[in-house]
């Protein structure tokens, strides 16, 4: 398995003899592409799991794409923070007995609920599901711990004949793992977790996983997040290309004339065909192939030919459909990208369901600004839209409260409502349960 993060794929290369350059990038749309049929992988004779994507690296590819863009990473963190609201609490009403109130307080003292809840909110916004683990005491009559298992390190076992996934596997799937490095945790049936928990406890089991999942139109083991359209479409690549073009312009004043998008499978096929496994030699081969593409482009320039095909033709005359060449108009000057970057940023914010005025997504540029009242409304709307996600995330906590017999307690996540000056305070907490 090739670690593409260690290879320098994205780069800007000069076109010899021309005041121009070519930008090499990786196809972002490929991250959700299933290149082959997905079948279970075996950790041992008794344990298997369903890979997340054809190469089992999809979550890490998604994280890498998010971390590679300033706007996208900021929007993701903003969405997680809005989902967090004022934090998870177990409210206790006047019907609660004093011992129940004390037990709830002790439960929160023994569990880092702030870190846990912000973590599952991030998993929800990144991947569309979150996994919590509940741990019972030795007697099996109380839940004493609740933990988050990072979604990117979770894999689901194949479903049984009834369509129920029996367990989750937790490990660092970035690299090859051995059986002893994998934690296997029984998964409570998402359709009836309360009944399943009571049955499993009778079998002397004390540790269980509970999955909270955003329903999607296409029911798969791992949901495709709503923002996948950013990568499947063009706007992510457009914004990345603008940054590359600006950098090239600032460094050597050479405009980008060609944009070459290369699928990761192109490099994988080369390494496999030529038996290259060493990282240094892989990078040398990448640089060699880039030179071949540059020679192909300069050869066309020298001969005065027009680029009719959008695909690269290798030295042996084969058309490579994994390498897409886009010719770029070079009449843009350095500062003229301002309008384009604003357009790209707004498209990203729109897809992420974040109003650009809430995250200051175009710093340093004059733009239409909303009034304070409009911003308060936007912030209130953003938090109100978290209601379905809270309902899904609360399932595990309703389970804990019921199992621990904390009658009169219920999970809640108050949100922060920004106030007006006449109320003499900046913000107040509002609960949807009131």
What is each residue range found by the language model?
Residues 89-116:
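A broadly used, surface-exposed interaction patch
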Residues 39-42, 47-49, 53-67, 274-285, ...:
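Extended, non-catalytic structural segments that build the interaction scaffolds
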Residues 161-184, 256, 285-369, 395-408:
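Long amphipathic alpha-helical segments
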Residues 132, 146, 258-262, 325-327, ...:
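Generic structural hydrophobic/aromatic packing signal, biased to beta-strands
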Residues 295, 349, 387-434:
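C-terminal anchoring/interaction modules
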Residues 62, 68-69, 78, 85, ...:
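C-terminal structured domain segments
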Residues 2-61, 106-303, 433:
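Structured, contiguous alpha/beta core segments that scaffold functional sites
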Residues 3-6, 50-51, 60-74, 79, ...:
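Intrinsic low-complexity, intrinsically disordered or marginally ordered coil/linker segments
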